Amino acid sequence: MTDLLTAAVLGLVEGLTEFLPVSSTGHLIITGYLLEYTGPKAESFQVAIQLGAILAVVFLYKERFAALFRFGTGHGRFSGLRGWYLLALTSAPASVLGLLTHSFIKEHLFGPVTVAWALAAGALYILAVEHKGEGTRYETLDDVSPALALGIGMFQCLALWPGFSRSAATIMGALLLGSRRRLAAEYSFVAAVPIMFAATGYDMYKSYSLFSPADIPFWAVGLLVSFASAWAAVKGFIHLVGRVTFRPFAWYRLALAPVVLLFWS
């Protein structure tokens, strides 16, 4: 497979899975092994192409992000300094824990076998939360409280285990804490932006020496495909989120996990 086609495939996998509760990192690791694109450079590329998916969310929720820069009244409660405060509360736990465990995660958890166990663990987590059902206390982004934002941030720490899924951790955590399904999904998407920007920037800073100007076309293809596929995935997911449960994602994960274990054990 040519280098640019490899970049396109990885960008497609990243975009389609980043905001679904199936783990984009897990799928990228598995896909990378299938394409024989592995190692430190591949791992950093898999993190870097998250930027395309991040920008897709910023584009889709541009009004919400614009409200964060409006500091007067009349823009809703999820705006201005209060909006930034809520996002900071959600981002802080995983940011701090991620900085402390970055080297350990890259060295010990970026592999198909550990991803398979994370896929299974995340599936059981989804099924357990679905058994409880959605809450009714929080319905829109303007209803998000500091306690809810921090609680979701604590659940987000589960996603530091590659394969668990940041979306699964935050969406199901929000449901446990009393959110409606649509709010859980939308806040998960919006709150992903600062933490993913931070994680991508930090990883690129740590790994910049691995790349050269010759890699720019490879990166560009991955980022563009990631952006387009994430845009489509988020649009479709939001359309369905109020109509279906998250159980199908759990069954998919439970089906995929043993296949990965059998293939790589």
UniProtKB/Swiss-Prot annotation:
Transmembrane region(s): 15-37, 41-61, 85-105, 109-129, 144-164, 183-203, 218-238, 244-264
GO molecular function: undecaprenyl-diphosphatase activity
InterPro entries associated with the record: UppP (IPR003824)
One example of a Gene Ontology biological process annotation: response to antibiotic
Topology within the bilayer: Multi-pass membrane protein
Keyword Ribosomal protein: no
Assigned keywords, A-Z: Antibiotic resistance, Cell inner membrane, Cell membrane, Cell shape, Cell wall biogenesis/degradation, Hydrolase, Membrane, Peptidoglycan synthesis, Transmembrane, Transmembrane helix
GO CC, alphabetical: plasma membrane
Enzyme class at the top of the EC tree: hydrolase
Summary of the function given for this chain in its UniProt record: Catalyzes the dephosphorylation of undecaprenyl diphosphate (UPP). Confers resistance to bacitracin.
Other information: Bacitracin is thought to be involved in the inhibition of peptidoglycan synthesis by sequestering undecaprenyl diphosphate, thereby reducing the pool of lipid carrier available.
Protein name as it appears in the record: Undecaprenyl-diphosphatase
Higher taxonomy: Bacteria, Pseudomonadati, Thermodesulfobacteriota, Desulfovibrionia, Desulfovibrionales
